[in-house]
Amino acid sequence: MARIIDGTEMNLIGATVRKYRKQRKMSQQALSGKLELMGVYVCRGSVSRIEDLSRTVTDIEAYAIAQVLQIPMEELFEGAKEKFE
């Protein structure tokens, strides 16, 4: 069985967050601000680390990110399947 996280990747959704954030022409600061309006405090630097796979993401943060990006939660994990193969 393949290892899911090799010690350098701290989450499975970072690349997807970056993809959809950029598609929506949203800056990391804007994403951070929209999350804050929902009561979820993720600073711009943390958004950067999430996208770089160097920060873990809580379930609450993942849910809020999906809401802000207007995508289903499952969509956040679109690239995760390859990690299991």
State what each model feature region is:
Residues K25-R49:
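Short alpha-helical DNA-recognition segment
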Residues M1-R24:
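A short, Lys/Arg-rich alpha-helix, primarily the initiator
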Residues K22, G33, Q67:
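Alpha-helical residues within the helix-turn-helix
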Residues T16, S27, T58-E61, P72:
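Residues that mark the N-terminal boundary/hinge immediately upstream of a DNA-recognition element
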Residues A15, K19, G33, R49, ...:
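DNA-binding alpha-helical recognition surfaces that contact promoter or target DNA
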Residues G45, D52-A64, K83:
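Short, basic-rich loop-to-helix N-cap that marks the start of a DNA-contacting helix
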Residues A2-G7, Q67, E74-E85:
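Short, charged recognition helix plus adjacent turn
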Residues K22, E36-L37, D52, K81:
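Residue-level detection of the helix-turn-helix DNA-binding "recognition helix"
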